[in-house]
């Protein structure tokens, strides 16, 4: 099943124009779609009481690039109460480049929004001053309209950069407008800057590459063990499916090369 033939490419899904832009930009850089195992590529389920059952759909999309990207994947969820776009780029460890992390989650009463160049090394060892200035500028522009959410704990904060966009919005029309306009514009700028940085970067030596491998593994292991979406996914799709999805697709260290 192609994602283009699903609800995730229609206006019914909140994040449709985000995933369309994302896929089109990866196409521009000659990324190749990666076939996800059928067990995880599409899943239907239902939740709620017998009298008010609601359907929910999940689609997992992936891509690679021979020289620059080990694995890029998007998990898309649609239902009346939950709408999710979770996206991660795992770059090749031949290049000293952070992850690109996107986590846009609409819950029954709020939206949780995360967008960042997520470091796999200490920030000072992975971001030069020019890149830091650029992402901080994008962050400030976005947060001139979107409120900044609560401070993260130290064990979580180390996996985010100074350019982190992190917001929590109540569900109402004003939030819809912010998502459709300010967040979408920031998302496009972030993605374009990330891909430009990744595809213009130079290869690193063996010693630094080993540090990057270790750093990527640390991040993926932490996310696998502490994924905040685990309870929600388990309640919607079952524990067995959720654990397999998290371990084999979303945060598998087999993707680190």
Swiss-Prot record:
Its EC number is 1.3.7.3. It catalyses: (3Z)-phycoerythrobilin + oxidized 2[4Fe-4S]-[ferredoxin] = 15,16-dihydrobiliverdin + reduced 2[4Fe-4S]-[ferredoxin] + 2 H(+). Coiled coil: none annotated. Transmembrane segments: none annotated. Keywords: Oxidoreductase. Pfam families: Fe_bilin_red. One of its GO terms (molecular function) is cobalt ion binding. GO terms for biological process: phytochromobilin biosynthetic process. InterPro entries: Ferredoxin-dep_bilin_Rdtase, Phycoerythrobilin_Fdx_Rdtase. NCBIfam families: PRK13248.1 (NF009721). Belongs to the HY2 family. Catalyzes the two-electron reduction of the C2 and C3(1) diene system of 15,16-dihydrobiliverdin. This is Phycoerythrobilin:ferredoxin oxidoreductase. The gene is pebB.
């Amino acid at each position: 099943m192609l994602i283009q033939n699903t609800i995730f490419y229609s206006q019914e899904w909140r994040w449709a124009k985000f995933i369309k832009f994302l896929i089109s930009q990866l196409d521009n850089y000659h990324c190749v779609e990666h076939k996800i195992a059928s067990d995880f590529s599409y899943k239907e389920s239902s939740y709620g009481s017998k009298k008010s059952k609601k359907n929910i759909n999940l689609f997992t999309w992936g891509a690679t690039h021979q020289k620059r990207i080990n694995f890029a994947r998007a998990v898309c969820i649609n239902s009346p109460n939950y709408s999710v776009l979770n996206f991660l780029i795992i770059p090749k460890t031949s290049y000293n480049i952070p992850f690109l992390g996107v986590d846009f989650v609409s819950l029954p009463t709020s939206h949780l929004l995360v967008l960042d160049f997520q470091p796999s090394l200490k920030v000072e060892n992975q971001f030069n001053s020019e890149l830091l200035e650029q992402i901080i500028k994008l962050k400030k522009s976005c947060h001139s309209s979107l409120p900044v959410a609560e401070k993260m704990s130290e064990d979580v904060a180390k996996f985010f950069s100074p350019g982190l966009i992190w917001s929590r919005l109540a569900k109402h029309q004003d939030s819809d407008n912010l998502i459709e306009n300010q967040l979408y514009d920031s998302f496009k700028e972030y993605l374009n800057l990330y891909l430009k940085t990744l595809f213009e970067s130079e290869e690193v030596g063996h010693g630094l590459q080993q540090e990057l491998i270790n750093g990527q593994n640390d991040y993926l292991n932490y996310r696998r063990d502490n994924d905040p979406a685990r309870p929600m996914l388990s309640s919607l799709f079952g524990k067995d499916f959720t654990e397999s999805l998290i371990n084999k697709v979303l945060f598998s260290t087999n993707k680190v090369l």
